């Protein structure tokens, strides 16, 4: 089918972007202008044959995430937990499924309080989406060290602290998000400006602290790298036993676990048993064909929703 108008062209771009058929920069360029340096980074990434972590990779990944959550068709796949189109998120790391899953599971009620532990949502496009849906929402970002990105003018609060000892009263937040963070708790966090530890059970301490500050009927959304258990010193890859421990320790009134796996056809839904033997990829390559079958980082993720 041929769409003659610019409106139709933009409307159908997100789907083709997700399948890797259109450069990611085009979609947002048509929506609004980009700086020349930003565009140059995107062009550099695509000229590199989409090699992960090459110049422009981060920018291209964020563009991809934005186009996914802006696409009614693609976003509905996360809302309704249905299969993604073949090729979705190829050559990108697990963030391309974690962010849409988080946004699909947030409650956009008025006057709610949201705590982001990490904080992975500290991007303008994330905050714009949260505040456009709920302008009265109170958003608090928790991190170990200061983040260069600061949106205090959008009424976003920033708190420095350890998730194992949160500086908040009991039953305060309606929602808490924790995107690929809990696996770092109690580990070597020197790269994040913190200390060297090796306390493998402290993710449970963090979990119970988040439960403490969460209101009754509130939701805790957690994502972790998933597969066979691995200890890399600065983080752990969770296996099924550890995921089950999270649920058992939290004692939720309701819970759900969604798994996504990376294959030569990109990211898609998967059952836990088909992810259980996956290893985390720590290798880097300048050969784009390496990433057709090998994940960029995590080969699978567990997305856990816990209702207090």
Describe each PLM feature range:
Residues 194-219:
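A short glycine-rich, Lys/Arg-flanked "PGG" loop and its adjoining helix->strand segment in the class I
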Residues 219-246:
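Conserved class I S-adenosyl-L-methionine
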Residues 1-83, 275-283, 297-303:
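Membrane-proximal basic amphipathic "stem/tether" segments
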Residues 25, 35, 158, 244-248, ...:
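A C-terminal cap/extension of S-adenosyl-L-methionine-dependent methyltransferases
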Residues 174-200:
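A short SAM/SAH-binding and catalytic strip from SAM-dependent methyltransferases
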Residues 113-165:
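Class I SAM-dependent methyltransferase SAM/SAH-binding core
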Residues 93-112, 123-129:
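Conserved alpha-helix/loop element of class I SAM-dependent methyltransferases that forms part
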């Amino acid at each position: 089918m041929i769409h003659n108008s610019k409106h139709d062209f933009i409307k159908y771009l997100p789907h083709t972007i997700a399948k890797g058929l259109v450069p990611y920069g085009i979609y947002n360029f048509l929506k609004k202008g980009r700086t020349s340096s930003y565009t140059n980074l995107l062009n550099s990434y695509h000229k590199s044959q989409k090699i992960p972590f090459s110049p422009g990779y981060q920018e291209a990944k964020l563009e991809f995430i934005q186009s996914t959550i802006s696409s009614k068709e693609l976003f509905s796949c996360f809302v309704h937990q249905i299969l993604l189109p073949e090729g979705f998120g190829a050559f990108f790391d697990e963030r391309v499924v974690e962010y849409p899953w988080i946004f699909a599971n947030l409650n956009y009620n008025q006057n709610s309080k949201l705590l982001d532990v990490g904080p992975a949502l500290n991007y303008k496009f994330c905050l714009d989406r949260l505040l456009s849906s709920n302008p009265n929402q109170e958003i608090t970002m928790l991190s170990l060290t200061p983040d260069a990105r600061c949106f205090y003018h959008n009424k976003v609060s920033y708190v420095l602290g350890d998730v194992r000892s949160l500086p908040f009263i009991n039953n305060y937040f309606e929602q808490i998000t924790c995107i690929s963070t809990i696996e770092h708790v109690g580990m070597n966090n020197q790269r994040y400006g913190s200390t060297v530890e090796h306390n493998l059970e402290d993710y449970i301490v963090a979990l119970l602290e988040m439960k403490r500050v969460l209101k009754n009927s509130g939701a805790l959304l957690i994502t972790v790298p998933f597969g066979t258990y691995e200890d890399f010193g600065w983080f752990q890859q969770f296996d099924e036993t550890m995921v089950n421990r999270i649920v058992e320790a939290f004692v939720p009134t309701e819970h759900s676990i969604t798994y996504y796996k990376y294959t030569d056809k990109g990211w898609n839904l998967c059952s836990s048993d088909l992810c259980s033997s996956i290893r985390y990829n720590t290798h880097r390559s300048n050969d784009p064909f390496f990433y057709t079958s090998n994940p960029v980082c995590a080969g699978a993720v567990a997305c856990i929703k816990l209702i207090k």
